[in-house]
Amino acid sequence: VLAALVSESALVGETAPAAGSTRPFAHGIERARLPTAVVVTPVGPPAMRGERRDVQHLGRAGARWRFPVEVAFSEARVMALLGALPGGLPGIGRPERVKAVLRVGEDEWVLVQRAGEAVTLAPTAWRRDNRIEVQLAPGEPWHPEAWDDLWLRACRR
């Protein structure tokens, strides 16, 4: 078994496992299976400069969005969206986890997280840009354009 692990580790450029490691090469092997090209999809009007990067990992689909610091989100719309997700928004899949750092005021930023049915909101010192991550449950259908639309509707106008 160790010989098989060592030969697999050579494929992904890993060195020998640390003493006592229970999964010595799992991360390296998984990294080797990841796509090398990242597709960046523009989101919203060109002036908004939003972007989405789709993610497929361990049977889960999802994406990461980035919007520039000039874009602000409506805290009420974001919370309504996340509160409705357990089954109230058809056609977008069932999210397993949502995490975002969003500007919701002139100098007010929040960390928003949803795992299971729980939604939390907390102030954060992050000020670089708006970031959103969505991970669907395994096997859920992925409709990225529908998610793009949801985030655009949550922006303040």
Model-inferred region functions:
Residues D129-R131:
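Active-site lining segments that contact anionic ligands and/or coordinate catalytic metals
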Residues V1-R127, P138-P141, W147-R157:
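C-terminal accessory "lid"/substrate-recognition subdomains
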